């Protein structure tokens, strides 16, 4: 499956989750957030526009039910940094996931996720460069 997404943030600040960095105010979008391009970075700085190109694959057809892979490249531009040039950021996201198909651990999933984020120097007050690798283990509990 292929994904193409566009997202635009507008207002007096980026989306601040209660407070945006040190700006201390809720932007004109209120307190609701629905973002298409949210991985490590949410790509929601002041005036930011972002594009995502992604790909996901289910390996069931290759005889490995429960295994999937997702990739995304997200590029954000037009970050208002209060100067003559706008800032930018980009992220590469990878995730490998396996869901146990049967037995006592049925529906348990293990995800290996990596992200590589790069932010232009003039937007460093908004976000920082970084690399991360995370492992998630989700074990659903069926109570009722």
Model-derived features: positions:
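Extracellular loop and loop/strand-boundary signature of outer-membrane beta-barrel proteins
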Residues: 38-42, 79-84, 120-125
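Outer-membrane beta-barrel "beta-signal"
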Residues: 32, 53, 94-96, 129-144
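Transmembrane beta-strands of outer-membrane beta-barrel pores
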Residues: 6-12, 49, 59, 73-79, ...
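Extracellular/periplasmic loop regions
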Residues: 1-65
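C-terminal/domain-terminus segments
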Residues: 66-95
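Residues that define the transmembrane beta-barrel architecture of outer-membrane proteins
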Residues: 47-51, 86-92, 127-133
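Short loop/turn motifs that connect adjacent beta-strands in outer-membrane beta-barrel proteins
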Residues: 60-67, 101-110, 142-144
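Transmembrane beta-strands of outer-membrane beta-barrel proteins
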Residues: 1-4, 53, 67-71, 94, ...
